[in-house]
Amino acid sequence: MADEAHFDVGDKMQNRPPRSRGDRGRGKGGGGGHGREVQVSKALSKLLRHQAANAGIQLDDEGYAPLDAVLVWGPLRSLKVTFDDIQSIVTSNDKQRFTLKPNTVKNPSLDTKSTTPADYLIRANQGHSIKLESAALLAPMTLEGGDVPERVLHGSFFYFWPRIVESGGLKPMSRNHIHCSTGTPEEGVVSGMRKDAELIIEIDVEASLKGGVKWWLSDNGVLLTEGDEQGVLSTKYFKLVTGRKVDVGVLWQDGQWISDLPAGLKISPPFGKGPRQGGGGGGGRGDRR
């Protein structure tokens, strides 16, 4: 887990707000400030979660990369991202998806007033497809530790539900983990569930822990699991499955099928996910996180 000398970062819920042509610059012309921040955080996510090796950037065991190397990566360099930009994301974003901390090699005094990128390391707190050891990146959640939340929820979509059932549960898909939250966006939870999720799958975490499934907690409060040895979080651990905004009745309860989705329900792939992105796990992300 991150040490005490660090900054937490959020990379806004990337709901992809409509973009005008004037939104592509460095915050000039077209009111692009917000749009540029989203561009920067998306680029950071892509690099630190998925593309570090391809970019020639070595992550340490905890998923950290040298900030100076990150800032010269092509997409970020083309955006002319500065240390101030990174620090702004660290201090002002709500999703807390990144952590920035002093580089103990180049900044042994752990000076957090430095504005030199080489003095810092940065990581994505979760959402990786790059293989990292969960124990180095995340805090374990155990029955013995008494830290199992009262509710653990996974957000999914009508489109994926039949495949979730057919495959026997949720899967990480292209990510290392299935992502869950302790509540919904309406309840003020900002990490762990997409704002457009249509289904709420409540997980019986205690039963799954007893069944040998490992659970983890990220620095930004996202609950994560790799599933069982086959990479599946079984439907037998589905405590309750209901619609989030549209009443579809109870689909699953206490590990048992109750009903199918209602006939005539409007079903379409969620934004940013389609037949190629879908699959048995319903995307594994549950947010956008």
Predicted regions and their residues:
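Eukaryotic, polar/proline-rich low-complexity intrinsically disordered regions
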Residues: 1-289
